[in-house]
């Protein structure tokens, strides 16, 4: 086989095509089908496609007149099966569009197909929807495998679970009963077990492992964002009220000492092995209960805390005792403070200087310091205060920040660096940036939403260049499929099936 001939249905902005391009597959686009005028503009710009290749409304296509092709890609509109779209299924016209996909397979009999849809269809109508779909693929001559894949495992910080169905024409491979991983009991494996009873034509596709969450949300955020994306202080305050306050750390036991021998037990041990006065606790935990009596032969000490030693990182050139020349790291604890605090006798701490907000680079008042270090000495001769850089603020995904009441069940705020909420066409999610409770909350930008679907910056710029508005850019991202997930599927499909057939 020379070039892989591809037909695309329900094309959107062409995630399947972007994935094939990204992994270097030489393919010929024989046609696509899309009815949204803005998506068509973006699609043609991104893929350098002639609009004459658009067959338009899939329900009006004469399938017999379609050109020949090897691979059919697409996912029929998912709103009718999704939780966000209220799950009307085949009762919704959009749900019945699935059968246009089946009719295309039946008439043209391409070698392969890749189909995508929402997780909700697996159990929709008590499993009958998936049963009908799987039986339909079998009836038109395809062996299938299916899997539930989450975008967060494909180098995209978005929690997006979708079902992917791969089909290979039955004359090209032998039937192979599905192997369901032992001990697996999720919704997809249950669905597969149910389908096996229907004698679905099947094979075992090698799916990518889902065990490593790659990129963090902070890695796809734009550095400079227009103020229009930020919520007002009033809205921000109301949202922050919905955050559960961080819990204090528990009392953490780390070891014990023998009062007579003064040794620290570094082995695995338990607090019950030591008397109360001999127990050592982590200083990062909360304090133990204070009592009014002496315990453990240690006078009035009720508990002991393990602390890190001062960390000396250098010397400065001063006259006098060695102790006053030492410079300490802010990562350790302070050395013992003495009453002789003048004449350079105070402890010196290294604080990272990261820049100056004065264009000339001069002036102490304009200096900016890293928040991971300690504050420089505060003085009273300037009223503008010290500028602190926050290099690693919390980045917390926020569900529909512009809505006072959230429309979906579940959390309003995720924890720092968790994957973003699922991008869709209805909800616009956001991020809280800062440290509790001093967050600034904003919406994700259109570019960030495209990045969450793993589209290249160049793809986004091409859509912008043909005049696509922000509202349409959001919609197009929400309607699309995560490109990196499709890349992983195509790599296996091409390597194991397409290339082997060509040899």
Curated annotation (Swiss-Prot):
Reaction equations catalysed: a 2'-deoxycytidine in DNA + S-adenosyl-L-methionine = a 5-methyl-2'-deoxycytidine in DNA + S-adenosyl-L-homocysteine + H(+)
SUPFAM superfamilies on file: S-adenosyl-L-methionine-dependent methyltransferases
SAM-dependent MTase C5-type domain mapped to chain residues: 4-500
Pfam families associated with the record: DNA_methylase
GO BP: any one term: symbiont-mediated evasion of host restriction-modification system
Active site (record annotation): 78
PROSITE patterns named among the record's database cross-references: C5_MTASE_1, C5_MTASE_2, SAM_MT_C5
MF GO annotations: DNA (cytosine-5-)-methyltransferase activity; DNA binding
Top-level class of the enzyme under EC nomenclature: transferase
Keywords attached to this entry: DNA-binding, Host-virus interaction, Inhibition of host innate immune response by virus, Methyltransferase, Restriction-modification system evasion by virus, S-adenosyl-L-methionine, Transferase, Viral immunoevasion
InterPro entries associated with the record: C5-MTase, C5_DNA_meth_AS, C5_MeTfrase, C5_meth_CS, SAM-dependent_MTases_sf
EC number annotated for this UniProt entry: 2.1.1.37
Family: Belongs to the class I-like SAM-binding methyltransferase superfamily. C5-methyltransferase family.
Its job: A methyltransferase that methylates C-? within the sequences 5'-GGCC-3' and 5'-GAGCTC-3'. Modification confers resistance against restriction enzymes that recognize these sequences.
Protein name: Orphan methyltransferase M.Rho11sI
Species of the source: Bacillus phage rho11s (Bacteriophage rho-11s)
